[in-house]
Amino acid sequence: TPREAGGMGLAAQWDDDVHHALHALLTGERQGYYSDFGSLDCLAAVLTGAFYHAGTWSSFRGRRHGRTVDRARMPGHRFVAFLQNHDQIGNRAVGDRLSASLSPRMLRVGATLLLTAPFTPMLFMGEEWAASTPWQYFTSHPEPELAAAVSAGRRREFAAHGWSTDDVPDPQAPSTFENSKLDWDEVKASPHREMLATYRELIRLRKTVPDLSDPRLSRVEVWHGDRHVAMRRGGC
């Protein structure tokens, strides 16, 4: 928000609500902070207004949260949106990416919604080819007490999300870091090659179709039924 409107004058803001809406809808997960997300109504709200919680009740927080974005004044490019990032993947019990649980078809649905939305899209490393390698939380703390505290804290958080802690990798183990490295050779193989082509085409469309780079939230319209959603950007 601009300083003259009472904000901090930042260039852009991380938009977790877009991630939560897409993730919960695509995966069906409803635990933890996904509890209020996952419906097409929720998806429509974030695509047109950036946030779902706009002074509404957050069951995860146990209180009202957020405030309404002024769609006429605030451009969409000031919101950084994503399907995956280092936090959302690294803070899962085993660091599994969306590609571990979603079909290529559903991954393309998510990519299309992200890259045709009015926000600044951010891609996580390897997302563009549906990398099969995990992104596991790893550390190199020299203090044994800190390392143990971090590991114990993560296990408590995973238990609260309903995830099994039996297979949680040790953040301090070198193998946890090694497991998180990308396998660049798989880019050449199917289905990774085809997924990369999909992302490239979506990025090309975003760069060449003027309405897809129009930042005005007031020119975004979304309709949906029980099993479909449609988004209109300007004249598109």
PLM regions and their residue ranges:
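Conserved alpha/beta catalytic core and glycan-binding cleft of carbohydrate-active enzymes
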Residues: T1-W163
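Glycan-recognition and catalytic regions of carbohydrate-active enzymes
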Residues: G49-G66, L123-F138, A152, A160-G235
